[in-house]
C-alpha cells in the first residue's frame, strides 16, 4: 500500500507493515517520532502534488489518503482503491479516536491481532507515563510553537492528539481558552504568563531550521515569562499534532520527562 496521509503511514507501520511509498517521506523521517519509516519506503513527493507516475510504478494495492485532502480522489482511484483516513473529530477523546482508528485499520488489513497487541502495549505505556507525571506533581502544561517574530505562539490541546495525551497523563492544559477544531489556538506570547508554574513544552522541529532560536534570542518578553525564569521549559524536537497512537505516546513520553525535570 501507499500512504498520502502521514496518519495512515504511521498506523500502517504500527501494524507491522511497510508502505511502498509515503508523501513527503523525507520530512516524515525528520519529524515523526515513531515508528521509524524504513528506507524501502519511497518518497512520493509533496502532500499537495504527489507524483502519480511514481505511484503507478510502485503498483500499490491500496492508497491511504487524508479524508480532508484537496487531492482529486478519482485520479488516485484509477491507480488503486483509496481508503480515506479521517482527522481527529472536534468532540472526541484523542486517545479513544486514535486507538479506534488503529483497531479499525487492523481489521481492514487483516492485522487485527497485531492491532490488539499494539493497543494493549500502548495502554501499558500510557499508564506508566501517567504514574510518572503524577509523581512529578502533575503541573499545568503549555504546548507551544512560537512564531518566528517571537510575538505570538500556536498552542495545542483540545480534543486532538495533545488533548488526548494530557488527559491520559492527568496533566492540565495551562491554556484554558478555546481551541480550533484541529486542536490549536493562536495567542500573544504574553498568554504563556497565565499559569506561572506551568511547564512550557516548546516545539523546536528539525524541519523548521532553528526558528525557535530565532524567536527567543534577544526576546525580552520570552525571558520575562515565569516559566522561562523558573527554567520550566523543555524542547519538543519531534512533534506532529495530527498523528496516531504512536505519535501520541511519543509526545506523552516527552511530556512526562519534561514535568519530571521541572520538579528537579
Model-derived regions, located:
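Structured C-terminal subdomain patch of bacterial secreted/periplasmic proteins
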Residues: 97-100, 198-264
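Short helix-initiation/N-cap motifs at beta->coil->alpha
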Residues: 44-52, 179-189
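A short, structured surface patch at a secondary-structure boundary
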Residues: 6-54
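Extracytoplasmic substrate-binding proteins
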Residues: 81-149, 241, 245-264
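Charged, glycine-enriched surface loops/patches
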Residues: 14, 73-112, 210-236
